[in-house]
């Protein structure tokens, strides 16, 4: 199957699909848009979404799989207040999030921007209290090693360790009932920045389903 299928009876040959393609692999001909290098497609779907008459099909983002926006868009004031209300949570209830809510939370991260639409994120969910404590202990041990190695962050690490070990305050895992790790393949050199974008989406979405989050 070709990458692009063009409905010639609809196509205006306006060229907007060519202009918006981030991979610069489309060109306009007398027959309509054509792809010069199929393997260069990042499957972002911009060419399909931007077409004003729905004349373009992309095998990676077919029109019949698109989901129309059925609810009204946020107005400026509502969107501003929604973004402004974002806050990290560092005091958690001893209540385990349901699998359904965790699935909703992780599903929303699929829509976060990633470099070159690379996506490729994986998630590890930890719900066992003993394992969470072991992870926090491992982080504390790592901080101790960093202090001994003369890390430029050693003052911060010392503050954390005093609270964690001397006062018994769980300043690392915050007694959270659940930890979620974002993972990417070793060769994915944008994995860290992709994860940060995904967590930003998750953090904004979490309060709408009654969850609190903090990013570490």
Model-derived segments and spans:
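Glycine/small-residue-rich phosphate/adenosyl-binding loop
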Residues: 124-195
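Small-aliphatic-rich amphipathic alpha-helix that forms the alpha element of a beta-alpha
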Residues: 12, 86, 105, 109, ...
């Amino acid at each position: 199957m070709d990458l692009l299928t063009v409905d010639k009876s609809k196509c205006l040959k306006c060229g907007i699909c060519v202009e918006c393609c981030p991979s610069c692999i489309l060109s306009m001909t007398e027959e309509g848009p054509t792809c010069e290098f199929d393997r260069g497609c990042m499957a972002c779907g911009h060419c399909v979404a931007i077409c004003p008459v729905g004349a373009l099909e992309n095998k990676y983002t077919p029109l019949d799989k698109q989901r129309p926006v059925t609810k009204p868009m946020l107005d400026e004031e509502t969107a501003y207040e929604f973004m402004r209300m974002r806050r990290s949570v560092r005091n958690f209830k001893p209540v385990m999030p349901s699998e359904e809510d965790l699935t909703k939370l992780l599903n929303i991260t699929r829509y976060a921007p990633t470099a070159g639409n690379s996506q490729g994120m994986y998630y590890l969910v930890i719900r066992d209290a003993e394992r969470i404590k072991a992870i926090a202990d491992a982080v504390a041990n790592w901080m101790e090693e960093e202090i001994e190695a003369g890390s430029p962050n050693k003052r911060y690490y010392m503050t954390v360790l005093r609270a964690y070990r001397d006062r018994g305050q769980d300043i690392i895992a915050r007694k959270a009932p659940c930890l979620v790790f974002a993972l990417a393949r070793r060769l994915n050199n944008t994995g860290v920045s992709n994860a940060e974008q995904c967590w930003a989406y998750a953090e904004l979405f979490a309060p709408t389903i009654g969850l609190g989050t903090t990013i570490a």
